[in-house]
Amino acid sequence: RLPIMKKMKNKYFLTISTCIFGLCLFLASGCSFISVSLVPPVEPLKETTVMGKGKEKVLIIEISGIISEEEKRGLAGISGEPDMVARIKEELKTAAKDKHLKAVILRINSPGGTVTASDMIYHEIEQFKKKTGNKVIACIMDLGASGGYYVAVSADKIVAHPTTVTGSIGVIMLNLSVEGLLQKIGVKDTSIKTGEHKDMGSPLKTMTEEERKIFQGILDNMYERFLSVIAENRKELTNEKLKSLADGRIYTARQALDYGLIDQIGYLDEAIELAKNEAGLTTARVIIYHRPGSYKNNIYSQLSNSSFSTINLLNIDLKTFVRSGTPSFMYLWAP
């Protein structure tokens, strides 16, 4: 029994000695702190062939969920992959360097998003087309409304699934007023400001008629921008016809085709064939860019498993875009 106790005692002292030695090393290093990242660094894009064969390529770019510059957040709010605008810019930049890439398909499933993010993606696609001369085809899946349609008109041709919902051409400002609620619980806004309209749009007060007119002027300007982008790319639409369509309503694929908002009703594989034809290709590999570690094996593979969860409009209104209390200008279908 004594030898066993002696061994245990030696083990105990060894453990204590190791801890003390480690502490001494830590103190000797000048109390340096070791930084440990909970999130692995974002790795460069990887190319995967999901269909076809040959040297020439057609790239599918996914535009799914709310269009914004907000980074996707993972567990405990930790930032995950880059925001949609940054990711699409990265994909287009990679595609522009590939001499074998001849066409791009925008696989759109979005109710829209912020005015600026929608316009930035539109601009990046336009710049890509000018730089490379490559054809771009938009294929709208379930939803391509408002900002989703804004992005789609950057394409040379727009294909919509038979069950697509599109349209919702217009601008909305998401804003809440909690003044009445605060009065009931005895809370009063005592903000100090330097100008009469400095706090316009604040949820802590009721919007005045003059403030409403100011906001309406801004929205009208953004609405005109939306119309000009459509008119520039859908030249068969007269100004009169376009304004009659752009009252915020949504359209089925059949209605959109009849009104000239899209070019064709079809499926994603038909959009791929159209892209090949537009690029003058008989055979081509269909590719997807993605981060290492994610499995992609067909043309419907998504970049993120959470893409559809971001189309929760209640979550948008109350969490993402109004959480700061400031108004948000949106090209968004938000019933």
Protein language model features and the residues they cover:
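N-terminal organellar transit peptides
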Residues: 6-138, 143-144, 155-161, 173-335
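Short gly/pro/ser/thr-enriched loop/turn and capping motifs at secondary-structure boundaries
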Residues: 145-146, 165-169
